[in-house]
Amino acid sequence: KLTINAACKMCRLCVKKGPEGAVEYVEDTVRPSVDKEEWKGIAVYVDHVDGKIHPVTLELLGKARELAQVTGHPVYALFMGNDIGEKCHELLHYGADKVFVYDEPELARFKIESYTAVFEDFIQNVKPSSILVGATTVGRQLAPRVAARMKTGLTADCTILEMNEDTDLSQIRPAFGGNIMAHIKTPDHRPQMATVRYKIMNAPERSEEESGEIVNCSIAKERLGSHVDVLDIVLKEKEKFIENADVLVVAGRGVKKQEDLEMLQKLADLLGGQLACTRPMAESGWLPAKCQIGLSGRTVRPKLIITCGVSGAVQFTAGMNHSENIFAINKDEKAPIFKTAHYCLVGDLYEVIPQLIQKIEEKKGA
């Protein structure tokens, strides 16, 4: 008996090893094609809350400007919301050639149906070659739906973006647990879409003068309908996020007991920082998932990060390798983290951390 289900990897082994004629692999004889000349420009989705623009948008505008230099394409920003007429001018200080604004009362709050409809309208009218979306809570919902609507590809959590002269975008991200870097392209479809996490790219400096133009867009009201009604909004108490910390102390597998985290927390408090962790620590429940650094956690870029008993797997270092100063403590002198760190200390964290705490306390008491 031969069974093929959704887990099929298209390896064709069943064709070669199975009974003759039982399984046939049929390939598309006509490869899809796209007229790339019709699609021009690199667009950035403007992620915001009540007009306050998320900094990942500015980072993506800087990257879009860099990519556009290869092809000579313009840089677009897609801004949708309500009462955002004044706020959209800020984007002209960060390299956007055109800001396409959809200012409608129905767009005051994020609703997936209406936001997708606006995104689709923008793509159909402007035809951007590439679209960059921040990997935020909203971006992670919106980008896949738009890609499916346009029948195009989407690469999530890219760490590197490179543009070819033929306007094909190389979307690069770690794969297979960080063991390889996958180079993904969408050569036969447009637009090309990618999401990028906050603090992966560098934000450009704000220019003194505006350069570019605002394009006010309209869309039929019936397209903004939604099956979701926002009845009330309850503001959460403001939290501290490791992405915003200037100093981080990171707990790795070298920490033997959950109680020992108090020692690292004390070090973090003395330095005015926060405690973070690697994936195994979060999965064991020792620290909440919001404290996890890496591809499956948060991306950080603090002024100082101290790793304690962290081996330094690629999936972890991809989330922190842009930190200004990386100080690594590990008793294994061959630990991969030492290839990433700026300062390396081979030693037992249970000996090093107490001494470090003592020195800092003495310095503060002096």
Predicted features and spans:
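N-terminal glycine-rich FAD/FM-binding segment characteristic of electron-transfer flavoproteins
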Residues: 1-366
